[in-house]
């Protein structure tokens, strides 16, 4: 890829005119930091548009080359401008969230196009609408906007504004021309399947809009907001989305909308009016039985008032018998007088239906699910109490269990040893172990244990009562029982699972989703351009100043990196960004940019989203300034970047970009 160097001669709203070292004039995309007289280095990707490059090779002496080239440029520029102005018939501004200005001739062919904000530049570069018919140019712009995610839901509204060049047309021609343009705009929007608003404008308002760096449509809404006392300043008018500013100001009186002009909307509007109840029964009756009297229908249909006026005049007595079938309650009232006819709406049986729904609380017996507490018999731990008999010794009243041992009918002499098992009756299923004492008849010296009932826990110590036949040693382990109680409390630690419910906090109501794609998807690039959309999918508002988003990449040979936010739906001034070098690099990530929000960013409510368009790169690259020799050659290899998405040109769910709230990871997978 070839590189050029040159000097910036002039800055315009969206481009910079540069004189190269080879004495060629080129137009570059305007970027932050550009200044007149500045030396810059650039390549073909930085050109404003390949079709707009104007080259003039110098054939004069080097010492006068600059002046001569500038003179040629000015002469041709003014000549072209004169020709262009003579053809300018009308001006069309399109606000999607990118804003684009088009100039057309009388045949509705686009003769000029320019971006009104930074987001519009790539769209215009791809669409190249110049010399296209207006319909084709707008269709292509809308298609590209959909592909790039600017039109991605039914909530998006496209705002068109148009004005006629008053210097070329008289009033009647202007009126006719604006109507033809509006018709074209409607056709384009409807064929593209988008919602739209069209605001006709004047040449005077267009000039005022240009002075404020606004499209005609946004300026008209701003003026309306000022008139109505709505809180909408110029900054908001520039940066808020079309849907947001339309939500603040009612433009219905001076804009043309795609809202269908159906009369079907009127009944909904007239429902609150008192005559309406009389209208609704009449509508239900008329379609069914008045087919034989079509003459009366048009008389009554114009307005509810005229309809009720006609009710008494054509005594509907012949039709009443017919209507009495389907609606006996309403027609008798209509028979007598129109006042009672309005009252006939009162018997709306829907109230009865509402009452019928009240029995639904019968479903409240769901509390019967409380038996779920039957899970409380978690004595599943009771099988574990094979060791729990030891605690049985803890209630040292070994003598007291003896009376309990009497029920153990197996061998009354042995019950002395059984007292140790007497605690087992607490877990009645355990008595199955009692048959083992039957093998103990061998110790005929059972009377000796009478003196040492406390030592009887020894069988529990062995944990296998089969060894109990050796009670001869029962005298020595007298000290052992004292140890066993010490271990017995250990099982009480089993309740430790209680902490598990701790995680169930209101935090779990906070849920987010991140979608992303990369605007530049080539492997090698001078700057990274991730586009990110953060959506609150939970039930609680999220304080944006507590949110951090991390995009991971390898810096390769690039140095002096900076982050810049080109655009956000909450304004770029509320977005922050820091480039961080990782202390523990990974194979595909040794750095990340951490994107955050200022305190003024406010909160992200459930269902809302924040969209961010960013760039990361060398500080000279982002401003197109000439870098020092040490930074001359630099490129990112995006294929080695962890967060790079080369598979999509639109927003998709992406978990290789992480999101943290108050330092806790809420979304994504770290590298």
Curated annotation (Swiss-Prot):
<comment type="function">
    <text>Anti-sigma factor for SigI2. Negatively regulates SigI2 activity through direct interaction. Binding of the polysaccharide substrate to the extracellular C-terminal sensing domain of RsgI2 may induce a conformational change in its N-terminal cytoplasmic region, leading to the release and activation of SigI2.</text>
</comment>
<feature type="transmembrane region" description="Helical">
    <location>
        <begin position="58"/>
        <end position="78"/>
    </location>
</feature>
<feature type="domain" description="CBM3">
    <location>
        <begin position="508"/>
        <end position="671"/>
    </location>
</feature>
<feature type="compositionally biased region" description="Low complexity">
    <location>
        <begin position="447"/>
        <end position="491"/>
    </location>
</feature>
<dbReference type="Pfam" id="PF12791">
    <property type="entry name" value="RsgI_N"/>
</dbReference>
<keyword id="KW-1003">Cell membrane</keyword>
<feature type="binding site">
    <location>
        <position position="641"/>
    </location>
    <ligand>
        <name>Ca(2+)</name>
    </ligand>
</feature>
<feature type="compositionally biased region" description="Pro residues">
    <location>
        <begin position="380"/>
        <end position="400"/>
    </location>
</feature>
<dbReference type="InterPro" id="IPR036966">
    <property type="entry name" value="CBM3_sf"/>
</dbReference>
<dbReference type="GO" id="GO:0046872">
    <property type="term" value="F:metal ion binding"/>
</dbReference>
<feature type="compositionally biased region" description="Pro residues">
    <location>
        <begin position="426"/>
        <end position="446"/>
    </location>
</feature>
<dbReference type="InterPro" id="IPR024449">
    <property type="entry name" value="Anti-sigma_RsgI_N"/>
</dbReference>
<keyword id="KW-1133">Transmembrane helix</keyword>
<dbReference type="InterPro" id="IPR008965">
    <property type="entry name" value="CBM2/CBM3_carb-bd_dom_sf"/>
</dbReference>
<dbReference type="GO" id="GO:0005886">
    <property type="term" value="C:plasma membrane"/>
</dbReference>
<dbReference type="InterPro" id="IPR001956">
    <property type="entry name" value="CBM3"/>
</dbReference>
<feature type="domain" description="RsgI N-terminal anti-sigma">
    <location>
        <begin position="4"/>
        <end position="51"/>
    </location>
</feature>
<comment type="subunit">
    <text>Interacts (via RsgI N-terminal anti-sigma domain) with SigI2.</text>
</comment>
<feature type="region of interest" description="Disordered">
    <location>
        <begin position="359"/>
        <end position="505"/>
    </location>
</feature>
<feature type="compositionally biased region" description="Pro residues">
    <location>
        <begin position="492"/>
        <end position="502"/>
    </location>
</feature>
<feature type="compositionally biased region" description="Low complexity">
    <location>
        <begin position="401"/>
        <end position="425"/>
    </location>
</feature>
<feature type="binding site">
    <location>
        <position position="640"/>
    </location>
    <ligand>
        <name>Ca(2+)</name>
    </ligand>
</feature>
<feature type="binding site">
    <location>
        <position position="554"/>
    </location>
    <ligand>
        <name>Ca(2+)</name>
    </ligand>
</feature>
<dbReference type="InterPro" id="IPR055431">
    <property type="entry name" value="RsgI_M"/>
</dbReference>
<feature type="binding site">
    <location>
        <position position="637"/>
    </location>
    <ligand>
        <name>Ca(2+)</name>
    </ligand>
</feature>
<feature type="topological domain" description="Extracellular">
    <location>
        <begin position="79"/>
        <end position="671"/>
    </location>
</feature>
<dbReference type="GO" id="GO:0030248">
    <property type="term" value="F:cellulose binding"/>
</dbReference>
<feature type="topological domain" description="Cytoplasmic">
    <location>
        <begin position="1"/>
        <end position="57"/>
    </location>
</feature>
<keyword id="KW-0106">Calcium</keyword>
<dbReference type="Pfam" id="PF23750">
    <property type="entry name" value="RsgI_M"/>
</dbReference>
<dbReference type="GO" id="GO:0005975">
    <property type="term" value="P:carbohydrate metabolic process"/>
</dbReference>
<keyword id="KW-0479">Metal-binding</keyword>
<feature type="binding site">
    <location>
        <position position="556"/>
    </location>
    <ligand>
        <name>Ca(2+)</name>
    </ligand>
</feature>
<feature type="compositionally biased region" description="Low complexity">
    <location>
        <begin position="359"/>
        <end position="379"/>
    </location>
</feature>
<feature type="region of interest" description="Disordered">
    <location>
        <begin position="290"/>
        <end position="323"/>
    </location>
</feature>
<keyword id="KW-0812">Transmembrane</keyword>
<dbReference type="Pfam" id="PF00942">
    <property type="entry name" value="CBM_3"/>
</dbReference>
<protein>
    <recommendedName>
        <fullName>Anti-sigma-I factor RsgI2</fullName>
    </recommendedName>
</protein>
<keyword id="KW-0472">Membrane</keyword>
